[in-house]
């Protein structure tokens, strides 16, 4: 015997929430893949300075997002199917998956908040090392290539923390090509541009995480209410 009355409304409401959750999983997966293949981040994070690769903390977070998006799509489908079939077993499994996902999201959020400045800091240190090598050693072609990639990708020139090297940077043609000396001097320093690059992307991820967390809380409540309704309807 199927559910009736308010429980039936909850059933379809849960289906709608799960469909939205499934779509959110698809959006997160799509955004993660976009961030993974975004030309700006790809150009910078695939660089190597001698035997030292660029910091990969950002990409670790992106791979986690890809996994989360895929799992969300699976869990959303499970919830939709469980609600339509009025299956207590599927809804119980769905609830358990949601609790695990929610706990993982909270843990990831805490880790992200604690380390939110570390990604940009690591990339800035990598840039500074390359800049110093490129200016000090005329034969450091690898370092010069790294610095030029930073400058052309971010449209910046030099660093305020290494202001003494600015003249050498201009003299060695390490600033974006096609710009004159005055325009290069007026460009933002690369530390500021690196901060802007990663803070914008982390802000986008943070908004998505909050929206998904709210949806998950509603889904956990609705799935338990529907489970109780199905159990009670089978008694009568």
UniProtKB/Swiss-Prot annotation:
Native organism: Chlorocebus aethiops
GO molecular-function terms, A-Z: cholesterol binding; integrin binding
TM annotation in the entry: 13-33, 64-84, 90-112, 202-224
Pfam families: Tetraspanin (PF00335)
Disulphide linkage map: 156-190, 157-175
PTM note: Not glycosylated. Likely constitutively palmitoylated at low levels. Protein palmitoylation is up-regulated upon coligation of BCR and CD9-C2R-CD81 complexes in lipid rafts.
Subunit (UniProt): Homodimer. Part of a complex composed of CD19, CR2/CD21, CD81 and IFITM1/CD225 in the membrane of mature B cells. Interacts (via the second extracellular domain) with CD19; this interaction is initiated early during biosynthesis in the ER and enables trafficking of only properly folded CD19. Part of a complex that includes MHC class II/HLA-DR molecules and IFITM1. Interacts with IFITM1. Interacts with IFITM2 and IFITM3. Part of integrin-tetraspanin complex composed of CD9, CD81, beta-1 and beta-2 integrins in the membrane of monocyte/macrophages.
Function comment: Structural component of specialized membrane microdomains known as tetraspanin-enriched microdomains (TERMs), which act as platforms for receptor clustering and signaling. Essential for trafficking and compartmentalization of CD19 receptor on the surface of activated B cells. Upon initial encounter with microbial pathogens, enables the assembly of CD19-CR2/CD21 and B cell receptor (BCR) complexes at signaling TERMs, lowering the threshold dose of antigen required to trigger B cell clonal expansion and antibody production.
Subcellular location, record wording: Cell membrane; Basolateral cell membrane
Family: Belongs to the tetraspanin (TM4SF) family.
Keywords on record: Adaptive immunity, Cell membrane, Disulfide bond, Immunity, Lipid-binding, Membrane, Transmembrane, Transmembrane helix
InterPro entries: Tetraspanin/Peripherin, Tetraspanin_animals, Tetraspanin_CS, Tetraspanin_EC2_sf
GO cellular component: basolateral plasma membrane; immunological synapse; membrane; plasma membrane; tetraspanin-enriched microdomain
Domain notes: Binds cholesterol in a cavity lined by the transmembrane spans.
Membrane topology: Multi-pass membrane protein
UniProt site (Important for interaction with integrin): 116, 144, 148
Claim: Disulfide bond is one of the keywords in the record: yes
Stated name of the protein: CD81 antigen
Residues exposed to the Cytoplasmic side: 1-12, 85-89, 225-236
GO biological process per UniProt: CD4-positive, alpha-beta T cell costimulation; cellular response to low-density lipoprotein particle stimulus; humoral immune response mediated by circulating immunoglobulin; immunological synapse formation; macrophage fusion; myoblast fusion involved in skeletal muscle regeneration; osteoclast fusion; positive regulation of B cell activation
Annotated residues for binding of cholesterol: 219
Extracellular topological domain residue ranges: 34-63, 113-201
């Amino acid at each position: 015997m199927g559910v009736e009355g308010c429980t039936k409304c909850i059933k379809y409401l849960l289906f709608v929430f799960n469909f939205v959750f499934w779509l959110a999983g698809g959006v997160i997966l799509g955004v993660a893949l976009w961030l993974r293949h975004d030309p700006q981040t790809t150009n910078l994070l695939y660089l190597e300075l001698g035997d030292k690769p660029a910091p990969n903390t950002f990409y670790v977070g992106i791979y986690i997002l890809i996994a989360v998006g895929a799992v969300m799509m699976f869990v959303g489908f499970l919830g939709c199917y469980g609600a339509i079939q009025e299956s207590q077993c599927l809804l119980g499994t769905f609830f358990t998956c949601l609790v695990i996902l929610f706990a993982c999201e909270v843990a990831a959020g805490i880790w992200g908040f604690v380390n939110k400045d570390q990604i940009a800091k690591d990339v800035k240190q990598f840039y500074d090392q390359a800049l110093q090598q490129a200016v000090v050693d005329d034969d450091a072609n690898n370092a010069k290539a790294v610095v030029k990639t930073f400058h052309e990708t971010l449209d910046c020139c030099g660093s305020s923390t290494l202001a003494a090297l600015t003249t050498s940077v201009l003299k060695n043609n390490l600033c974006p090509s096609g710009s004159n000396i005055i325009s290069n001097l007026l460009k933002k320093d690369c530390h500021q541009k690196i901060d802007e690059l990663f803070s914008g992307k982390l802000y986008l991820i943070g908004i998505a995480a909050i929206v998904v967390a709210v949806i998950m809380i509603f889904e956990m409540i609705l799935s338990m209410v529907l489970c109780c309704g199905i159990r009670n309807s089978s008694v009568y």
